[in-house]
UniProtKB/Swiss-Prot annotation:
Organism: Danio rerio (Zebrafish)
PROSITE patterns reported in the protein's UniProt record: RWD, UPF0029
Assembly description: Interacts with GCN1; prevents the interaction of GCN1 with EIF2AK4/GCN2 and inhibits EIF2AK4/GCN2 kinase activity. Interaction with RPL39; this interaction occurs in a GCN1-independent manner. Associates with ribosomes; this interaction occurs in a GCN1-independent manner. Associates with actin; this interaction occurs in a GCN1-independent manner.
Gene this protein is translated from: impact
Family from the record: Belongs to the IMPACT family.
Listed name of the protein: Protein IMPACT
Length: 317
């Protein structure tokens, strides 16, 4: 028993020393997600072309480094197919060649080397969001939508709304309580918005936060009402979590909330949640909408049967 405890203590000490070294070497690129659960991430970019970027999320098991590898996930929407397999194989080869040793620095530099090679042989990453960490879902139905015309974000539709000036004040961003299930964590963020430029400003501000930027997925949806045109501009983003953006937007439609952006960050913990992940995403969103006065309680909204007679912007206090 004492030997086992000594073994665990030695591993923990090695982990602490390795994390301290990586934090010192990489500075702001290194991010602690959950120190107690030993979850970390690092954002790795090609020096000359920062558009080539990968986020490496790492979970350190108790037996690392002596007898178990780190649990890792590579987050990059553009990295797919053979390229993803090649990079994963390279990381696994490093572990095999250095079994029992601390290898995170070697992994980071291998990824950086991979990005450098990619940048020299390609114009730029394909940012099509097709990478999934879980089994795919189905797009939401389009029933129960408000009886007004709907506009998708485009250069034409954006002109309907008053553009935000460059010196316009950044909308206030609210952060909700996190939900954790099987090592995956979900956290909602909300902001009142009146035009697409404000949406982008809020997203940019959120992504300045290292922890949010390193999330496996940042799913968002927004709805903006234009009274003159009796139209709603709305859009959503899965960020690789297939169908999640559409489901989140559908929730906003059912509640008929307007002039609001909701973002849900998910940090994937290595265990598949199946359909539960959609439940957590929408529960996070609903909770912060209720908290900020955009929606009624769950009991009241369920009585409405998905048909909201009065569109809801934020309620005055």
């Amino acid at each position: 028993m004492d030997k086992l405890e000594d073994h665990d203590d030695n591993n923990l000490q090695s982990q602490i020393e390795e994390i301290e070294a990586l934090s010192s070497i990489y500075g702001e690129e290194w991010c602690v997600i959950d120190e107690a659960a030993r979850v970390f991430c690092i954002r790795i970019s090609e020096t000359q072309q920062p558009k080539w970027t990968v986020c490496l999320q790492i979970i350190l098991p108790p037996d690392y480094p002596s007898s178990a590898p780190p649990i890792y996930q590579i987050n990059a929407a553009w990295l797919r197919g053979q390229d993803r397999m090649t990079l994963s194989n390279s990381l696994e080869e490093i572990y095999v060649e250095n079994a029992g040793e601390s290898i995170l620095y070697l992994w980071v530099e291998k990824i950086r080397e991979f990005l450098t090679e990619k940048s020299q042989h390609s114009d730029g990453p394909d940012t099509c969001k097709t990478v999934m960490t879980e089994e795919g879902g189905h797009d939401c139905d389009e029933d129960d939508l408000p009886d007004i015309s709907v506009l998708k974000l485009s250069s034409q539709s954006e002109q309907i709304f008053s553009p935000a000036s460059d010196d316009e004040e950044l909308p206030l961003i609210k952060h909700g309580e996190s939900i954790t299930d099987r090592r995956s964590t979900f956290q909602p963020h909300l902001s009142a918005v009146e035009n697409p430029k404000q949406v982008q400003r809020v997203l940019n501000k959120l992504y300045e936060n290292k922890k949010i930027a390193s999330a496996t997925h940042n799913i968002y949806a927004y709805r903006i009402y234009c009274q003159e045109k009796n139209s709603v501009l709305q859009d959503c983003e899965d960020d690789g979590e297939t169908a999640a953006g559409g489901r989140l937007l559908h929730l906003l439609q059912i509640l008929d909330v307007r002039n609001v952006l909701v973002v849900v960050s998910r940090w994937y913990g290595g265990i598949l949640l199946g359909p539960d992940r959609f439940k957590h995403i929408n529960n996070c969103a609903r909770t912060i909408l209720i908290q900020e006065g955009y929606a009624d309680s769950t009991e009241e909204t369920s009585k409405a049967g998905g048909k909201s007679k009065k569109p809801k912007s934020k309620k005055t206090k």
